[in-house]
Structures are given as C-alpha cells and as structure tokens.
Design a protein with these regions (language model features):
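Bacterial N-terminal signal peptides
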Residues: 1-6
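Zn2+-dependent metallopeptidase catalytic domains
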Residues: 10-114
C-alpha cells in the first residue's frame, strides 16, 4: 500500500502550459492587484469592467482545461484531478468579487450582469 502511494507521488504530474488569450490589462479586474494584501482596487473598477473580465476569465479557464484534456502524457491524479482543481484562478477571483458585491451593494445594473 505504501509503495503504491509512493509510486503515485513519483508520477509525471506536469500539465502543458495553456495557450491563454491576450488579456486587456487596462481592465482593473484583469490586471494584477498591486494593493495591500492584493485587495481589489475598488476605486478603479467600473460596472462596465465586469462583462469583458468575465468573458476573458472564462476563455482563460477553457484554455487551461483544453491543456489538461489534451495532455499527451498518461493521466495521473496530479495532472488531471489536481490540475482541474487549480485551473480557473482568474475566474474565481473575478466571480468572488462580483458576487460578494452583488450581495452587499447591489444595483439594477449589477443585477443585469448577474
């Protein structure tokens, strides 16, 4: 039993790098948050930023999933399950911000986006 666990840990768990779409870094939701504790730059974010950011983040997630699905290496727990769990970081960041604000400080415009 211990041997099989060790063997699984030695498997090649690498995933080819995804070909991510070009991001519009002028959108504050897509750019790095160089703020204390990497908090969102609320003063720079406008409602019009959300839809293009969601579209770009979904495209990134699809590219990351495509890289996992089309990995020529033998599937392992690491290069399949763990990789799927780790993909979508940008989408999670944008959705987390949007849906928290939607609950805390909603507006008709935000409801339309949701």
């Amino acid at each position: 039993m211990a041997f099989s666990a060790m063997a699984a840990g030695c498997a090649d768990n690498s995933v080819p790098k995804a070909q991510l779409p070009e991001l519009d870094l002028s959108n504050p939701l897509l750019a790095a948050w160089n703020t204390p504790h990497e908090t969102p730059p609320f003063s720079e974010i406008e409602l019009a930023d959300y839809e293009p950011a969601f579209d770009a983040a979904i495209a990134c997630s699809r590219a990351e999933i495509d890289a996992i699905v089309n990995n020529p290496k033998k599937p392992t727990f690491g290069n399949t399950i763990v990789a799927l769990e780790r993909q979508g970081e940008l989408l999670n960041r944008i959705a987390g911000l949007f849906f928290n604000l939607l609950e805390a400080d909603t507006s008709d415009e935000m409801q339309e986006i949701a």
